[in-house]
Amino acid sequence: MSSAICPCGSGDLLLACCGRYHAGQPAPCAEKLMRSRYSAYVLGLTDYLVQTTLPVQQSGLNREAIAQWSAQSTWLGLEVESSEVFGGKPEHAFVTFTARWHDGNGEHSHKERSSFVQNQGRWYFIDSTVPLKAGRNDACPCGSEQKFKKCCSPYVV
């Protein structure tokens, strides 16, 4: 494994690339987290995929479905189109990418603009398939201690 190339497409060794994030080191930016999540799908690291999703959404994830999709797919590649901060707030970012894979139904390509938020030095993926339940004046679900309307509301809705 020490000489394995990272599946994220960087061309670097896994241990020097996404492997360190899988081992617990915080990803330094949203793009690195997104790349490490793609690599986690390739490697079947379901726990990592759950742990790097916004904490308030983790209980809404279907671990079995994630593991099954990961295992039943042959991952063909990742292309990152862009990575950008949102609204001048360095703790909010979008990453636009295309992931390709093959499964029992053929070859697939999925382009997505994913949302990420940083809290206490860690980046988290905001899963659009798991609803965020917060009123405008409620504490933000990202854990920032700001009101939802002043933090993630304009970013995730």
Swiss-Prot record:
Pfam family, one: SEC-C
Matching SUPFAM superfamilies: NTF2-like, Sec-C motif
Family, similarity comment: Belongs to the UPF0225 family.
Protein name from the UniProt record: UPF0225 protein PSPPH_1399
Species annotation: Pseudomonas savastanoi pv. phaseolicola (strain 1448A / Race 6)
